[in-house]
Amino acid sequence: MLILTRRVGETLMVGDEVSVTVLGVKGNQVRIGVNAPKDIAVHREEIYQRIQHERAMQSQMQHLEQGNFPTSFDDDDFFNR
């Protein structure tokens, strides 16, 4: 992890197209602004995790709708017991 110190009004660059600017500090909260191209998604971590969880759930539902049921055993072994 790269650790940087920035003051209010200072900016850091992520690659050539994304800039992050410190807009203000109040107590233990830091206000930042992010400039990025529209094709680059920018989310708070908790929102990103929720999106990832929802995508995983949608993927599982699609597999179930298509009849792709995950199994942890071999069907032949199960029925020949």
Curated annotation (Swiss-Prot):
GO molecular function: mRNA 5'-UTR binding
Keyword RNA-binding: yes
Pfam annotation, one family: CsrA
Gene Ontology CC: one annotated term: cytosol
Disordered: region residues: 59-81
Biased composition (Polar residues): 59-71
Transmembrane portions of the chain: none
Principal subcellular localisation of the protein: cytoplasm
Keyword line: Activator, Cytoplasm, Repressor, RNA-binding, Translation regulation
Biological process terms in GO annotation: mRNA catabolic process; negative regulation of translational initiation; positive regulation of translational initiation; regulation of carbohydrate metabolic process
InterPro entries: CsrA, CsrA_sf
Subcellular location: Cytoplasm
Family: Belongs to the CsrA/RsmA family.
Stated role: A key translational regulator that binds mRNA to regulate translation initiation and/or mRNA stability. Mediates global changes in gene expression, shifting from rapid growth to stress survival by linking envelope stress, the stringent response and the catabolite repression systems. Usually binds in the 5'-UTR; binding at or near the Shine-Dalgarno sequence prevents ribosome-binding, repressing translation, binding elsewhere in the 5'-UTR can activate translation and/or stabilize the mRNA. Its function is antagonized by small RNA(s).
Alphabetized NCBIfam families for the sequence: csrA, PRK01712.1
Subunit structure: Homodimer; the beta-strands of each monomer intercalate to form a hydrophobic core, while the alpha-helices form wings that extend away from the core.
HAMAP family hit by this protein: CsrA
Name assigned to this protein: Translational regulator CsrA
